[in-house]
Amino acid sequence: MAAPGRKINFAAGPAKLPEEVLLKMQEEQLNFNNLGVSVIEMSHRSKEFGALLNETISLIRELMNVPDNFEILFMQGGGTGQFAAIPLNLKGDHEHADYIVTGAWSSKAADEAGKYINVKKVFQPSKPYVTVPDQENWVHDEKAAYLYYCANETVHGIEFTPTAPESHNVPLVADVSSNFMARPFDFKDHGVVFGGAQKNLGAAGLTIVIVRKDLIGKQQAITPSVFSYKEMIANNSLYNTPPTGGIYTTNLVLKWIKSKGGLQAIYELNLQKSGMIYDIIDNSNGFYHCAVDKRYRSIMNVCFRIGGPSGNDELEEKFLKGSIERNMISLKGHRSVGGIRASLYNAISVEETQVLATWMNEFQKLHNTN
């Protein structure tokens, strides 16, 4: 039962947190574990915070089944900070890195990486971003330092499903910011897996970086210490003051995921939620339109237009206004693409998704002239 005044929050990030997590945070805000202080007041060097940090690492390893040859780091700077940290840490003796550009975030990552390493795109990106070109047409180079991809493009609603791209014998680097723990993850061929916590795993300010051990120690001389994987590992993510409140929040979210049955159970719920919305789109006779190739539709960010492929601004404004009247917020699409975007992260329930589905059906009956 939702607390009074709570909205159904479909924001793309920062996003909804499970209510159980928020209530636990409220309960412990003044007095964490009977220590007489809040977590955000504790010394990051204290044994109590050290225990919390190590427990959080263990929960990530357990839930994602992270292999023993990977380290788990807590960093800052968001996913965007990792756009620079990746080439700074992984360049080694290599001259270039390969990038798969399928949307706004992988495009930004390639642009940022170009400051620190030569970037080669395995195919020429074409706009609008609606699909992932067939891999047999990609141009790979086994001399690349790594092959980078964004597992889920939040802005455009494109997700690598059900598996990662072929690595072609170089380490895969995955930005999983917007589908972190939304489904089971296969670490095969991966060298680095990273993401900001603010969509599926907690609050803004914490970046989780999972690094294969054999890739550590290849950082460029200009790498800032706070972005150095080697420094962070040597100091158990305590090289400088970490986002203590963010780590605490993620700890609670991880326990919530575990209580729900783990990643497979969460994945099945996410399939149910996204399927509910995509079914309405596909059966609307064009009233709702999702341009994304069905093979790569995101289960996290459902992007669509109303009134045809290019959208009808008047209809979309009416839809958003009606959504707010029905206690739903943050359904407006990203400013660069427009339309509607329903972000169905782990904390969004099936029941909340059903409220959106009901409104979509009602709205179509009111305004469909076909």
From Swiss-Prot:
Quaternary context: Homodimer.
Needed cofactors: pyridoxal 5'-phosphate
Pathway(s) per entry: Amino-acid biosynthesis; L-serine biosynthesis; L-serine from 3-phospho-D-glycerate: step 2/3; Cofactor biosynthesis; pyridoxine 5'-phosphate biosynthesis; pyridoxine 5'-phosphate from D-erythrose 4-phosphate: step 3/5
Signal peptide segment: none
Modified residues (N6-(pyridoxal phosphate)lysine): K199
Catalytic activity: O-phospho-L-serine + 2-oxoglutarate = 3-phosphooxypyruvate + L-glutamate; 4-(phosphooxy)-L-threonine + 2-oxoglutarate = (R)-3-hydroxy-2-oxo-4-phosphooxybutanoate + L-glutamate
GO molecular function: O-phospho-L-serine:2-oxoglutarate aminotransferase activity; pyridoxal phosphate binding
Positions bound to L-glutamate: R45
Protein's UniProt name: Probable phosphoserine aminotransferase
The keyword Transferase is assigned to this record: yes
Entry keyword set: Amino-acid biosynthesis, Aminotransferase, Pyridoxal phosphate, Serine biosynthesis, Transferase
Organism whose genome encodes this protein: Caenorhabditis elegans
GO terms of biological process kind: L-serine biosynthetic process
